[in-house]
Amino acid sequence: KIIGTPEGFYDEDDPYYFPGAMADRSIEWLHGVRAQDAHKPFFVYYSTGCSHAPHHVANEWADKYKGKFDQGWDKLREEIFARQKELGVVPPDAELTPRNEAFPAWDDVPDKLKPFYARQMEVYAGYSENADHNVGRVINAIEELGELENTLIMWIWGDNGASMEGTVTGSFNELTMQNGIPLTDEMQVQLSERYGGMEQWGASIMAPHYGAAWAWAGNTPFQWGKQVGSHLGGTRNPMVLHWPARTTDAGGLRSQFAHVIDVAPTVLEVAGIPAPRMVDGIEQEPMHGASFVGSLVDYSAPEHRTQQYFETIGNRAMYDDGWLWSCRIQRIPWKFDPETIAHFAPGKWNPDDDPCEL
């Protein structure tokens, strides 16, 4: 359904914010469905832009995290790792992968620039909490309708690992990286000042992205992030499932391997609907995914998937029955300059004139 743009789009006193509008319209739609039919099942696909760049959020959200990241990304990564052990997400004897030399040590960042970097993560955190808040509004609406216990909710946080495309410095405008424009952190600060300074970092006047080392911390315990499909830091995302009517171990963990292509078959099985063979008169290929309903209701269920291939920009991996084969190309995610890309340019030759591929 089209959300539309309100007349007061540029109202400074009450600015329009798309994530909030998404929640408003989703709630409106849910109440409309129930008003028409008290028993009709419903399906909502709520896909927020968060936490993809640009990181846009009002200061009232970002400011909640002032000072929360002054310890820097190295310490933050250690803190996250400790919490993961407490939660049982990683084994108690697991060791944290070391920082790659591509990421600067927080202690090496000049003191005058640390507030610049810390604000980047404050904005990202506020952006993330706002998304969580709006999802919560939709879930509260489902509860108000009396349907929460019997509704399967899949909350998938992301479509890849945290993005390192903000480069080492972070950027007041994410398009600088995409256009191969190298900027130092001091240049980023100077350019930010032209648009109102760091207090405007999450505002609509900028298109900000945080520094790659913050993404590295966010991807704890993994090594890399988005674009590096050879490693779990590039492909793995948290998923929270809520279905009180069928699950009995609230807060339980699952270790069975699953892939995003398994979501649709799972939803169809839960709804008791066969996969469509025809859509708009076009015959459909069989779905490649496999339902994970078994592991959803039983933590000891056997693996439903034993193989999966991954590939992103030449980085590739193969999961096979508990093992992961990986091959990473020697390019870090934020390097798009001509000299770097030249190493990966395709070759060409005429096999008639050059049979030996010289």
Language model feature labels by segment:
Residues 1, 40, 45, 54-62, ...:
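Short, solvent-exposed loop/turn and secondary-structure capping segments
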Residues 1-62, 66, 71, 75, ...:
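Formylglycine-dependent
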Residues 1-10, 67, 139-140, 175-302, ...:
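Substrate-binding rim/cap in mid-to-C-terminal beta-strand-loop elements of soluble/periplasmic
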Residues 17-24, 78, 122, 129-136, ...:
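A structural signal for well-ordered alpha-helical segments within the folded catalytic domains
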Residues 35-36, 51-57, 160-171, 298-305:
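Secretory-pathway/luminal and periplasmic proteins that interact with or process carbohydrate-rich
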Residues 38-42, 90, 94-101, 130-168, ...:
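Metal-dependent active-site segment of extracytoplasmic phospho-/sulfohydrolases and closely related
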Residues 42-47, 152-156, 221-223, 239-242, ...:
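Structural recognition of the beta-strand scaffold that forms the well-ordered cores
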Residues 209-217, 221-237, 310-358:
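C-terminal, low-complexity/hydrophilic appendages and adjacent surface loops
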